C-alpha cells in the first residue's frame, strides 16, 4: 500500500545545480509534498548513516549518564548556578521526555558580544561530553544545516529568485537553528490524551516554528501526521535510509500560507526511544516578510525572526522559562 508520506530522492540537488531537468523535477516533487502533506521522507541526501548512528549513540550515552552529568547542561531555570537560559538539557519532569537542545557549536564565548539575541548562547559541552563526541556533534550540525540550505534553495527556485538570497535569511552563528535530542524514557503514563480521537500521546499535537525540520527517528517510530483535509492521522513509517522533513510556521509565513505547517504528534509507548530533529531556523535578525519570496523589492516592514520565534515558543512548556 502506498504510504501517505511521500519519499523523494533529492540526490539531483546535491551538486547545487538547481537548473538541471532532474533537479527541477525533484523540486516539483518537494513542492507537491509541502502543499499536499507538509511531510516527506528524503533519500539520497548525502549524509552517511554511520555519522547519524554515531550521533545517536552519543545522545543515548548522555541520556543514560548520571543526573549530575546531565544537569551540568541544564538551563538556569532548573539549576540556578548555570548561566544558559535557552539551550541545554531539560528533564522528563517537564513534559514526559528528556531533551537536549544544541545551537551552532561554532559559537565561542569570545564572540558572544557580537550577537544581540538572548537565543544565541555558548553551551560548554566539555562539562558533559568528551572531545571526540563534541567534534561529531559539531560535524553533524554543519552537515544537516547544509542539507537544510539545499532544500530551502529548492523552494527559492520555485519563486524564480536567485538562490543566493538564502544567505540573507541564514547565517551560521546568527542562525537560531537547533539540533535537538528527544529521549523518551519508559513513560509510565501519557503526556496527554488526544481530545480528537482519545489516543494516548507521548508528545502533544503541535506544529514546528522554523522553515523546515529534518528528523531522524529510530525504528521504534511513533510519529504521526494529520491530514489537513480529513483530519485523520497517518503513521510516518521507519526507513533506515531516510530522513523525515516537515514544513514549519516560518515557511508558512514566508510563502503566504502556500506551504502550511502540519500538525504532528508522537504516540505513547512504554519502550525507550530517541529521535533527533534539526529545526532549521533563520538568523535572529532576519526580517520576516512575505516579500522575501513573493515580491520583487525588499520591504523594510516585517518581524525579526527572534520575535517570531518567541511568540511561537509560548505553546511549548519546556521553553516557559
Model region roles, listed by residue range:
Residues 1-321:
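Peripheral, non-catalytic segments flanking oxidoreductase cores
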Amino acid at each position: 500500500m502506498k504510504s501517505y508520506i511521500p519519499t523523494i530522492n533529492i540526490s539531483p540537488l546535491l551538486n547545487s545545480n538547481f537548473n538541471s531537468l532532474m533537479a527541477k523535477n525533484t523540486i516539483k516533487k518537494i513542492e507537491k509534498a509541502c502543499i499536499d502533506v507538509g511531510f516527506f521522507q528524503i533519500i539520497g541526501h548525502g549524509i552517511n548513516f554511520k555519522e547519524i548512528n554515531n550521533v545517536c549513540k552519543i545522545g543515548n550515552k548522555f541520556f543514560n549518564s548520571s543526573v549530575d552529568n546531565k544537569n551540568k547542561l541544564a538551563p538556569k531555570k532548573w539549576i540556578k548556578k548555570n548561566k544558559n537560559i535557552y539551550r541545554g538539557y531539560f528533564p522528563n519532569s517537564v513534559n514526559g521526555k528528556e531533551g537536549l537542545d544544541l545551537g551552532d557549536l561554532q559559537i565561542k564565548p569570545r564572540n558572544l558580544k557580537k550577537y544581540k539575541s538572548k537565543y544565541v548562547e555558548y553551551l560548554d559541552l566539555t562539562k558533559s561530553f568528551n572531545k571526540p563526541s563534541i567534534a561529531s556533534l559539531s560535524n553533524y550540525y554543519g552537515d544537516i544545516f547544509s542539507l537544510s540550505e539545499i532544500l530551502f534553495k529548492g523552494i527559492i527556485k520555485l519563486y524564480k529568485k536567485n538562490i543566493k538570497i538564502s544567505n540573507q535569511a541564514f547565517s551560521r552563528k546568527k542562525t537560531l537553528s537547533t539540533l535537538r535530542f528527544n529521549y523518551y524514557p519508559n513513560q509510565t503514563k501519557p503526556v496527554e490524551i488526544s481530545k480528537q480521537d482519545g489516543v494516548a500521546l507521548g508528545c502533544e499535537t503541535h506544529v514546528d516554528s522554523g522553515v523546515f525540520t529534518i528528523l531522524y527517528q529510530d525504528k521504534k517510530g511513533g510519529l504521526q501526521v494529520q491530514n489537513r483535509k480529513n483530519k485523520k492521522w497517518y503513521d510516518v513509517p521507519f526507513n533506515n535510509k531516510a530522513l523525515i522533513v516537515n514544513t514549519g510556521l516560518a515557511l508558512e509565513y514566508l510563502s503566504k500560507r502556500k506551504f502550511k505547517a502540519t500538525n504532528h504528534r508522537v504516540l505513547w509507548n512504554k519502550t525507550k526511544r530517541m529521535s533527533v530533529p534539526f529545526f532549521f531556523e533563520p538568523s535572529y535578525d532576519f526580517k520576516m516578510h512575505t516579500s522575501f519570496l513573493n515580491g520583487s523589492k525588499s520591504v523594510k516592514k516585517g518581524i525579526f525572526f527572534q520575535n517570531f520565534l518567541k511568540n511561537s515558543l509560548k505553546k511549548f512548556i519546556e521553553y516557559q522559562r
